[in-house]
């Protein structure tokens, strides 16, 4: 068995941070779209945004362009932990399963993707909670990352920082279990078929495909996860809106219809698409460094 390779961990973290910075305003509109229209939360009952472009324009006009990067600090911190662990663990698990990349199968890649997604997302969950809380707030009433962290910890305790961890792990299992294997398999078949070489164009097409498939598979879980993380706990520890993840899913479907589970799909895909393209193009170039 070969020694643990550090490069996928470092390259994965760097590429993840680069992709996050490039697509963060789209992610912010996705969060705002997903939390609006909740009949059981007066703070988010109003439908303020008609779609992604309207949200971008209204937030920029009313809160300033800086508001489009509300929550970027915990988002970068999240990618430094989540992205690093996710890619490093995925690549390491694959090499434990099979020695050569040519011998990888879809099943092996999916299992490795699911495991790496669950592990990395569970560890990085507090940064995810911070990011969503900061994105949901109007920038006029928003404090910094440390203030937000202390506010959650003081009012909700340690449990507040791991709120929605099961949903986050489920979403990560779906996203990572779909996106990374789809990228690897698409890239492998394009190269082995002779249609394309190991080029930037191949990386672009493979990453675009995995972003679309990942968005379709993960959006319902993402909506529920976002709402669960955004709701505040009462002083007695109870939650004001949803009793749990299943209750959130059923209430959302019942009160707003099935397609409410696909709220924010376009910004979700338009984020996952460019995010994956930036990530994989950066990652593939970093792999070529002679270190």
UniProtKB/Swiss-Prot annotation:
Compartments in which it is found: Mitochondrion inner membrane
Assembly and interaction partners: Interacts with VDAC1.
Tissue expression per record: Present in kidney (at protein level). Expressed predominantly within the kidney cortex in the proximal and distal tubules and at lower levels in the testis and white adipose tissue.
InterPro entries assigned to the protein according to its UniProt record, in alphabetical order: Mit_carrier, Mito_Metabolite_Transporter, Mitochondrial_sb/sol_carrier, Mt_carrier_dom_sf
Pfam families tied to this protein: Mito_carr
Induction record: Up-regulated during fasting and in the regenerative phase following renal tubular injury.
Keywords associated with the record: Acetylation, Membrane, Mitochondrion, Mitochondrion inner membrane, Repeat, Transmembrane, Transmembrane helix, Transport
Keyword Transmembrane helix carried by entry: yes
Membrane-spanning segments: 9-26, 71-89, 106-124, 164-183, 204-224, 264-283
Protein name (Swiss-Prot/TrEMBL): Kidney mitochondrial carrier protein 1
Family: Belongs to the mitochondrial carrier (TC 2.A.29) family.
Membrane topology: Multi-pass membrane protein
GO molecular function terms attached to this record: solute:inorganic anion antiporter activity
Organism this protein belongs to: Mus musculus
Major location (coarse): mitochondrion
A single Gene Ontology CC term: mitochondrial inner membrane
